[in-house]
Design a protein with these regions (language model features):
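Short, acidic/polar
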Residues: 6-23, 69-84, 129-138, 157-158, ...
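Aromatic-lined substrate-binding rim segments of carbohydrate-active enzymes
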Residues: 29-30, 34-63, 101-125
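Substrate-binding cleft of secreted/luminal carbohydrate-active enzymes
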Residues: 153-154, 177-256
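Active-site groove signature of glycoside hydrolases
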Residues: 29-34, 78-106, 218-224
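Glycoside hydrolase catalytic-domain groove-lining segments
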Residues: 38, 42-46, 150-189
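Aromatic-lined carbohydrate-recognition surfaces of secreted/lumenal glycan-active proteins
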Residues: 1-11, 57-68, 109-136, 146-147, ...
Length: 256
């Protein structure tokens, strides 16, 4: 059974009663860094306290640029310091186009991880990043690989699961996934950013009820909590998907 993670970006986007609707989640992951800077640390601390009081393990995450080894090392030191001061048990290194376009992305990722480990050796470290630059040596410095698997078509998401989970450089025990919450696509309201229920028998019609059972991620991370484009699927279902806590219940039932 995977561990289920709820990623939080900003406290202000959360419903005042948000902790009443996180049943089934094992972990709440809170944004605490942006590059080499702390990110709304006081607000993050309040979210962390609320999540801890609700009995959840708490991780941190940050958007990281890691455009050079020196800068990545500084980012790693800052992130580790925040994990230490906020008592976080895991950290998600979120690295996207800036990192992927750098001259030596794999070396920069390693520099971040090594710097982070020096100060926070006991904190679980997730490579929550673009897929293309990932290799075996780089992933060896992280505890988990957590690619972003997004899409507004059920076939797109299924295809990305298949591709990301067939990366030869990643051991099965490190495989995780970050997925959308199933909120409605505002550009096409017949689509959603994620699908819980399979729509047919073919692989291309697989929702999370089938994909999680088939690919067995160690952690399944939902991005993100709170209001997005006027919708909060933590609190209110939509025409395609139920609220997140109910999604988790269905996934768990599908695995039993």
């Amino acid at each position: 059974m995977p561990k289920f993670v709820l990623t939080v970006w900003k406290k202000e986007l959360l419903n005042p009663e948000w902790t009443s609707n996180i049943e089934g989640f094992d972990v709440v992951s809170v944004k605490v860094a942006d590059g080499v800077k702390e990110y709304h640390k006081e607000d993050a601390a309040e979210v962390i306290e609320a999540a801890s009081s609700a009995g959840k393990e708490v991780h941190g995450w940050g958007f990281h640029y890691s455009t050079s080894e020196d800068y990545a090392r500084k980012e790693g030191e800052v992130a580790a310091g925040l994990c230490e001061s906020l008592s976080l048990s895991g950290y998600h290194w979120n690295a996207e186009k800036e990192w992927a376009a750098s001259d030596e992305p794999d070396d920069n990722a390693i520099a971040f991880a090594q710097s982070f480990r020096l100060r926070a050796p006991g904190v679980k470290l997730f490579a929550n990043c673009f897929n293309a630059p990932v290799n075996e040596v780089m992933i060896g410095h992280f505890d988990y690989y957590e690619p972003m698997i997004y899409g507004t078509r059920i076939s797109t998401i299924a295809g990305k699961f298949q591709k990301r989970f067939s990366t030869p450089s990643v051991d099965e025990s490190k495989q995780c996934a970050m997925v959308g919450t199933g909120r409605i696509n505002t550009k096409n309201t017949k689509q959603a950013w994620g699908y819980l229920n399979s729509t047919g028998d073919s692989f291309d019609e697989s929702g999370l009820d089938r994909l999680v059972r088939s690919f067995k991620p160690e952690y399944l991370n939902f991005f993100r909590a709170g209001v997005i484009d006027g919708e909060d699927i933590m609190m209110v279902p939509n025409d395609i998907n139920p609220v997140l806590s109910d999604q988790i219940n269905v996934i768990k039932d599908s695995i039993k």
